[in-house]
Amino acid sequence: MKIYISIKDETQISFVAGKSNAHPSHVSRAEKRDDISVLKAGIVYGANASGKSNVIKAIALLQQIANGSFPQSKVEPFKLADTEEKNSKVEIEFKTKGKCFAYGIEFTIGGIKEEWLFEINSRTDKEVFTRKITAAGNEFTFGKVDGNEETSMLLKFIAHSTPSDSSFLSEYVRRNGKGLETIHMAKNWFADGLKIIFPSTRLQGISFLTENNDELQETTRSLLAYFNTGISDERLYKIKKEDVNLSSDLLDNILSKAKNGKAYSMAATVGGEMLLFEVNANGGYEIYKQKAVHRNLTSGTEVVFDLSEESDGSIRLLDFIPMLIDLKQNEVDYLIDEIDRSMHPMLSQKILECYFSGLESGRDTQLIFSTHECNLLNLDLIRADEVWFVEKGKDGASHLTSLAEFKPRKDVRKGYLLGRYGAIPLLPKEEMKW
């Protein structure tokens, strides 16, 4: 990353596993000579306004652009730069379906300037495509292209007609490009394999995922009991359409997602509430509301609560339970900004412990989050190379440092609070006179 919000010079954060033998289940180990060993967890610390959220924002922006959008309002270059270079840059290396890729872009508020995708391993980088936009238009180079002359001509047509505010990655998939099948793997990861949660993000909710799955319902109830929320279950309740203040634009958007006349469901926030829309093959739809079920300990009867009656912390936790189920069952990567927002500090640790307990050696998953919760700095729980610190320098730019560089002693938490690793607020010692 470089020249983006608080990031000035080219900066990287890496979750490639070091040589430590600690917590071996936390590592997706290389099976072949050229493979890359990858950590399954990452924790980012920093004081308020240090820039730790900007690291996640940069990846979220890259995801949006990879998926075909170019949100100009989120293109925020580093404003304190003393350099004439104006292009921002974000690149990510990721693993999906057993292959590792590097995808990146250089951009300004006006659009994409460069874009590239490489298939990588520990020794070599193999080009899939490289794109540069000049005054003459798109200039491309490609790696190995499979197929005949017709395939090659279609590929060149898509390449040279891709607009500057759209990624070639998304255009290739949208226009059914052929010859570079690894692009589909990379695009699918951005669309389905990378999931980013900000403090304002609401996931679809537990009941939307488990309504017709007895096994998932039982897993959900077990997690609700484990986190001691007081909620015994979550359920869907059908509501009348006339009781929902649904704008025509939102309804059109929901119904437009029907594909080939197939039934489907989707969640949407309406008036601050999460609702589930089930659309049948003919375009008819039903609306459901998610509610929390409590149990009266004296009588044993169930009492149903609207989610608006639950605390912010309980709702935040309810959003994380589908994530934990997803991580346990699928090869996905989650990034969370401020995991401890609105929650008791002990819950962050319980979420991490729950994730670690479900890790399996044959499944590549990853959970990365930013936090202030220093109780997680425990080498009995985590590896040193899983932890990064973000600190702002005098130039106003964010700088990143790995805990592994410090060769930490056992009591990492104490060292952090004493300022040994930086990334804490620098407050004046004298009293405020006001």
List each model region and its residues.
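Electropositive, glycine-dotted interaction segments
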Residues: 102-257
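Short Pro/Gly-enriched beta-strand edge/turn motifs at strand-loop
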Residues: 72-76, 271-274, 371-373
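Short beta-strand segments that buttress and anchor functional surface loops
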Residues: 90-95, 117, 292-294
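Extended helical coiled-coil dimerization/tether regions that scaffold
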Residues: 2, 202-309, 420, 430-434
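Short acidic/polar mixed-charge low-complexity motifs
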Residues: 7-9, 97-101, 111, 123-125, ...
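Switch/communication elements of ASCE P-loop NTPase nucleotide-binding domains
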Residues: 1-64, 287, 291-430
